[in-house]
Each structure stands twice: as C-alpha cells, then as structure tokens.
C-alpha cells in the first residue's frame, strides 16, 4: 500500500512540474512553444526518473517496515503475547519429568570412576593388600601421602604407617592408578566435611575402616572398569 501511494505521489509531482514549465514558456512564445518546452523539459529531466523511482520505493519499504514494527509492538502490548508464550513454555515443562534432586534427601547416581574419600582394601582373607611399594607416595603430585614400612618374619613388606593429608589431596586418582594390587582406592563417599583440620589427617586405621565399609561397592566399580584400565 505504501509503495502504491509513493508511486502515485511521484506521478503527480512530475505532472505538476511539466505543467508549470509549459505555462512559463506559453507566456512568451505561444502554444507551440509550450508543447516544445514541455517535451524539452521532459527530455532534459528524464534521466532522474529511475533514480526517483528507486528512492521512492526505498522510502516505501522503510515505511512498510516501520508500520510492521509498530503493528507488531501494538499487538504484543494489547494481547500480551509475550507473556502468553512464556506461560505456554512453563506449562509445557510443568507436566514433564522433573529433573530437580532434593538433596540431601535424594541423591543422584555416581559414576564408577568417581573419585571420593580414600580407602585401603583387604583381601577376602582379611590380609592387607598394600605391599609398601610406595609408588602412590612417589607419584602423588601434592605430596599428601606418607608411608613407613618394615619387613615381616616371612620376608614380605607391610606398612606400619600410611597417612594421607586430605587437605593437600587434589583427588587426581594417580595413587589408585599406580597401585599394582588395587590397595589404595578412592571410594564413593563425598560427604566427609569436618569441623577441624585434624579430622582430615587420615591414618592407616581410618583408611582400612573406609575400605571395609565400601568393599562391595569398590569391588563392583573396579570390576566394571577393568576392561578400560
């Protein structure tokens, strides 16, 4: 609609210019000169016709865009369409399965590779797995592990001291990867916050206690990951 009005206004403007030019020439040289002047004026100014058309059409497009934006804003304001779209999205997710977990009463599943609180494991006979090779102590980047060992009567080596400073540990899992007998592992527990620093200094008894508590779960996790180690 705006484009049609623009073209009509342009045609009216051209006609008026031609008429004014014809009247000016007629006053001096008569009717024949009027026609000649009209044709000359039209010929002289014909080069600007295409340019004017382009300008008018561009203006019409801009006006059309402006009116469309005004119309859209008016509709949104009048009928509150944005709020309706938001409510529709809310209703869509209202009936879908909830993804929120009400922690700590609900807990999500943990990966078998989860690295949590440390533990020392035993064999089924009750014998400690650790052979005091000190590979875990050597590989620990945080230097959080301290081991002391001695030789037993049968010639085997066993630890007399196995300490982990949990405030230094970065839970990289290198100790577990380095252990040749799967003695030191990182268990599934992540809720071991304490009120004092001393409670985070784990000794051998504490680590063995953790291993006895989670042995079933730890063994299952190691079994499921055995193909990828």
UniProtKB/Swiss-Prot annotation:
<feature type="binding site">
    <location>
        <position position="169"/>
    </location>
    <ligand>
        <name>[4Fe-4S] cluster 2</name>
    </ligand>
</feature>
<comment type="similarity">
    <text>Belongs to the complex I 23 kDa subunit family.</text>
</comment>
<keyword id="KW-0520">NAD</keyword>
<feature type="binding site">
    <location>
        <position position="133"/>
    </location>
    <ligand>
        <name>[4Fe-4S] cluster 1</name>
    </ligand>
</feature>
<keyword id="KW-1278">Translocase</keyword>
<keyword id="KW-0472">Membrane</keyword>
<dbReference type="GO" id="GO:0005743">
    <property type="term" value="C:mitochondrial inner membrane"/>
</dbReference>
<feature type="domain" description="4Fe-4S ferredoxin-type 2">
    <location>
        <begin position="160"/>
        <end position="189"/>
    </location>
</feature>
<keyword id="KW-0813">Transport</keyword>
<protein>
    <recommendedName>
        <fullName>NADH dehydrogenase [ubiquinone] iron-sulfur protein 8, mitochondrial</fullName>
        <ecNumber>7.1.1.2</ecNumber>
    </recommendedName>
</protein>
<dbReference type="GO" id="GO:0006120">
    <property type="term" value="P:mitochondrial electron transport, NADH to ubiquinone"/>
</dbReference>
<feature type="binding site">
    <location>
        <position position="136"/>
    </location>
    <ligand>
        <name>[4Fe-4S] cluster 1</name>
    </ligand>
</feature>
<dbReference type="GO" id="GO:0046872">
    <property type="term" value="F:metal ion binding"/>
</dbReference>
<keyword id="KW-0560">Oxidoreductase</keyword>
<keyword id="KW-0249">Electron transport</keyword>
<keyword id="KW-0411">Iron-sulfur</keyword>
<dbReference type="InterPro" id="IPR017896">
    <property type="entry name" value="4Fe4S_Fe-S-bd"/>
</dbReference>
<dbReference type="GO" id="GO:0008137">
    <property type="term" value="F:NADH dehydrogenase (ubiquinone) activity"/>
</dbReference>
<comment type="subunit">
    <text>Complex I is composed of about 45 different subunits. This is a component of the iron-sulfur (IP) fragment of the enzyme.</text>
</comment>
<dbReference type="Pfam" id="PF12838">
    <property type="entry name" value="Fer4_7"/>
</dbReference>
<feature type="domain" description="4Fe-4S ferredoxin-type 1">
    <location>
        <begin position="121"/>
        <end position="150"/>
    </location>
</feature>
<dbReference type="InterPro" id="IPR010226">
    <property type="entry name" value="NADH_quinone_OxRdtase_chainI"/>
</dbReference>
<keyword id="KW-0809">Transit peptide</keyword>
<feature type="binding site">
    <location>
        <position position="140"/>
    </location>
    <ligand>
        <name>[4Fe-4S] cluster 2</name>
    </ligand>
</feature>
<feature type="binding site">
    <location>
        <position position="179"/>
    </location>
    <ligand>
        <name>[4Fe-4S] cluster 1</name>
    </ligand>
</feature>
<keyword id="KW-0004">4Fe-4S</keyword>
<feature type="binding site">
    <location>
        <position position="172"/>
    </location>
    <ligand>
        <name>[4Fe-4S] cluster 2</name>
    </ligand>
</feature>
<keyword id="KW-0830">Ubiquinone</keyword>
<dbReference type="GO" id="GO:0045271">
    <property type="term" value="C:respiratory chain complex I"/>
</dbReference>
<keyword id="KW-0679">Respiratory chain</keyword>
<keyword id="KW-0408">Iron</keyword>
<feature type="transit peptide" description="Mitochondrion">
    <location>
        <begin position="1"/>
        <end position="41"/>
    </location>
</feature>
<comment type="function">
    <text>Core subunit of the mitochondrial membrane respiratory chain NADH dehydrogenase (Complex I) that is believed to belong to the minimal assembly required for catalysis. Complex I functions in the transfer of electrons from NADH to the respiratory chain. The immediate electron acceptor for the enzyme is believed to be ubiquinone. May donate electrons to ubiquinone.</text>
</comment>
<keyword id="KW-0479">Metal-binding</keyword>
<keyword id="KW-0496">Mitochondrion</keyword>
<dbReference type="InterPro" id="IPR017900">
    <property type="entry name" value="4Fe4S_Fe_S_CS"/>
</dbReference>
<dbReference type="GO" id="GO:0032981">
    <property type="term" value="P:mitochondrial respiratory chain complex I assembly"/>
</dbReference>
<keyword id="KW-0677">Repeat</keyword>
<keyword id="KW-0999">Mitochondrion inner membrane</keyword>
<dbReference type="GO" id="GO:0051539">
    <property type="term" value="F:4 iron, 4 sulfur cluster binding"/>
</dbReference>
<feature type="binding site">
    <location>
        <position position="175"/>
    </location>
    <ligand>
        <name>[4Fe-4S] cluster 2</name>
    </ligand>
</feature>
<feature type="binding site">
    <location>
        <position position="130"/>
    </location>
    <ligand>
        <name>[4Fe-4S] cluster 1</name>
    </ligand>
</feature>
